[in-house]
Regions:
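Long, hydrophobic alpha-helical segments that serve as membrane-spanning/inserting helices
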Residues: 1-13, 34-244
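Hydrophobic membrane-insertion alpha-helices, especially the h-region
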Residues: 18-32
């Protein structure tokens, strides 16, 4: 039995030309679709970065505040530690302060939320994979540092509440004295860590080209409760020095 392939009406040469035209048309359509998709992601990425600016600006201000305030915070904690160590059988009470937003405290330190909602949304929506690779790496590094600061800051907030006890003339035995000193030392170490991470985050945000203007940073620091407290009590502040 013999099979015969059907012949195109106008011959194989013309048929091949028609098929070629169709293939080229499909390739052009696919290429145009890819160009449109790339343009859409470019526009979406640009809009997302614009939406990210306020969140990054807030974190940049918080990191600057933390870096500047930590030397003052450490001095306050060192004074409290000396008070615990030098007290007799009863704690010599530390001064207690209060403000509109804080009912009472024995030392003043930054307490921030270190927001990341916009960045998380960019990850969920797949926008970050379409960012410039260098920008993506820097932002990811910055937000990783900020995330660690958030967790640590929650911990120092809890210690601050517990150290309100230092404003009372509570009995001290060797165990309770050592425990209080350990709490204070933990807070000092945590603030040192946050200072380092803050300065590293400052560098990443700065390198990303998304840092706020210096005048905005200065204006925010001028109204920082911790900075104002340190200046009012003559306790030295530090500097915000971006580092690797």
């Amino acid at each position: 039995m013999h099979f015969h392939l059907p012949k195109p009406l106008h011959g194989w040469r013309e048929f091949a030309g028609e098929v070629g035209i169709i293939v080229i048309g499909v390739l052009i359509a696919l290429g145009f679709e890819a160009i449109v998709a790339d343009w859409q992601w470019h526009e979406k990425s640009k809009a997302a970065v614009d939406a990210l600016r306020p969140e990054l600006a807030a974190n940049f201000l918080y990191a600057s505040e933390m870096a500047i305030a930590v030397p003052c915070v450490d001095q306050q904690l060192a004074n409290l530690e000396d008070r615990v160590a030098s007290s007799g059988a009863e704690l010599n009470p530390a001064p207690q302060y209060s403000e509109a937003i804080y009912a009472r405290y024995t030392y003043r330190a930054p307490s921030r939320e270190w927001p990341d909602q916009v960045w998380d949304a960019m990850i969920v929506e797949g926008v970050t994979s379409h960012l410039d690779p260098a920008l993506r790496r820097r932002l990811a590094r910055a937000y990783n540092l900020l995330s660690m600061n958030r967790a640590t800051n929650h911990g120092t907030d809890a210690i601050a509440y517990r150290l309100q006890l230092l404003a009372r003339p509570v009995p001290l035995d060797p165990t309770s004295r050592n425990h209080l000193i350990e709490e204070i030392e933990e807070a000092r170490g945590d603030f040192d860590d946050m200072k380092l991470r803050s300065e590293q985050a400052l560098r990443m945000i700065d390198l990303s080209g998304l840092a706020p203007a210096q005048r905005d940073v200065d204006a925010a620091l001028a109204v920082s409760g911790t900075v104002k407290f340190c200046r009012a009590h003559g306790i030295a502040l530090g500097k915000a020095e971006p580092r690797s």
